Structures are given as structure tokens and as C-alpha cells.
Amino acid sequence: LNVIPFKSSCMSMVVSNRTELSGHLYRHILLDYILYNNIPIDIYGNGTDRGLYKTRGKQIKSTRIKGPFKRYEPYHEYMFTICIENTRSKHYFSEKIINPLLSNTTPSYIGCENIESYFPNNVLHLTGDIHQDMNLLINILRDPAGYYKKIDTFKVEQKVSLIQNVSKLYGKQSIKESKNN
């Protein structure tokens, strides 16, 4: 039995008003689908106004549109969140996945192709195909306990802490040399 810590809401998503990169565009494609199909996912970010989202020349009003947020607000009370990096790469990941993991919120994620090597078994994987991804998100909403990942936030903190990882990045010998100079 998978035990879920108490969180008052199921799923969130963060969007900006940017559309230059592939991740920006895919966020807006997902958001359009979510809002037009009335899927119960709360939306945060500068790409929205409290209660209002503009898309395809239309304005959509919804109580699910929360607007700008404080750093961890879209994660603390949510079991799941949708995380889409601005671009895909082999080893780059950002606060888009770090903040949810530190909040013990399971990310549905696309971006870093090798994310499992950094955060094994902590991530649900989006594909970039709107139909497959919406199917996954709807299944998560129907059966949260079946998809929830138990996240060791201490291990996440260790993985992303620059101070703890400096010797891994530069090697212990390089650190000793720079101290002696």
C-alpha cells in the first residue's frame, strides 16, 4: 500500500507567458487542452491572471487559474504537478523539477532525458505527445495512490546542493589546489 502524505489538492501546473521555445509552446498546448476540457488541474504562473487565461484570441475564466505565485506555492499542497523544461537535453534540469521534488510533490515531467540518473523512481514521464500525456494525467487524477511517488526530500537536497557537490563537480584535488593558492 502506497501511503500518501496529506496534501489538500491533487495536481498543479505552472506556465509563463513565454512562447519562444518548444517547452513554452508545449505548456500552452497542454494548458489549452486542460482548460477546454475542464480537467481539474490548478494553474499558476505569470502566463495567467487570477481567474483568467487568454488563448487563441479568447479569454477563459476559471477558479482553477491561480495566477502568479510564491516559490513553493504550486507544490506544497499538491500531490502532483506538471513540469516541462523550456528545452529537452541529456543532463540539464532546473527548478521546474527541483522545487516540486523538494516539496514532496510527484512531477509529471519532460525535459532532461537522463532525469532517472539524478532522481531515480521519483518522476512520471511525459512524452511530448498531447494524447499520451493527457491520458497519463487523467489516469493520475483518477487513481492518485497508484501513481504517487514517495520522494526522499533529503536525498534530493543532497543531489542539488552545490556546496555538497562541489568536489564531485571539480574533483577533490582541484579544491585542495585552489585552497593552497
Give the positions of each predicted feature:
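Pol beta-like nucleotidyltransferase catalytic core
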Residues: 1-44, 54-83, 88-181
